[in-house]
Swiss-Prot record:
The keyword Mitochondrion does not apply. GO terms for biological process: rRNA 5'-end processing. Could be a nuclease involved in processing of the 5'-end of pre-16S rRNA. This is Putative pre-16S rRNA nuclease. It comes from Lactococcus lactis subsp. cremoris (strain SK11). Keywords: Cytoplasm, Hydrolase, Nuclease, Ribosome biogenesis.
Length: 143
């Protein structure tokens, strides 16, 4: 493969960012970008810097689904964000089911002894790691 993939956990106020290694085997946290989706501030200025730095071949967005698998308003917002992202940066966009990733991220931080006030700073980028890692695992090359 030898190309990176960015993983994004898109919310209404933040975007958690993760990146794969060059082999597409592991995901690492990058940062959390503050956005204001209602005001149309999508964090694309900062994403442009990260895209230039990491040169990803693709971006994977978390797709929030209901527990029964149906897509709701948040999934529609994620797909809209993905369309805008693809148009802005001419990158392939893929989607990964993100059910329970934020809960998993919070559990990891709690188990790691991270204080409540510090968890908020890390939860979105850790959720982005889980989204991207799930995608990488599902699309791993079979050797």
């Amino acid at each position: 493969m030898f190309a990176r993939i960015l993983g994004l956990d898109v919310g209404t106020k933040t975007v958690g960012v993760s990146v794969s290694d060059l082999l597409g085997m592991t995901a690492q946290p990058v940062e959390t970008i503050k956005i204001d989706s209602e005001a149309g501030e999508l964090g694309f200025d900062r994403l442009a810097v990260l895209i230039k730095e990491y040169k990803p071949e693709k971006v994977v967005l978390g797709l929030p689904k209901h527990m029964n698998g149906d897509e709701g308003i948040r999934a529609e917002a994620s797909r809209d964000y993905g369309t805008k992202l693809a148009n802005e940066f001419s990158l392939e966009v893929a989607y990964q089911d993100e059910r329970l990733t934020t809960a998993q991220a919070e559990k990891v931080l709690i188990d790691g002894g991270v204080r409540r006030k510090d968890r908020k700073k890390s939860i979105d980028k850790l959720a982005a790691v889980l989204i991207l890692q799930n995608y990488l695992d599902a699309h791993a090359l079979k050797l």
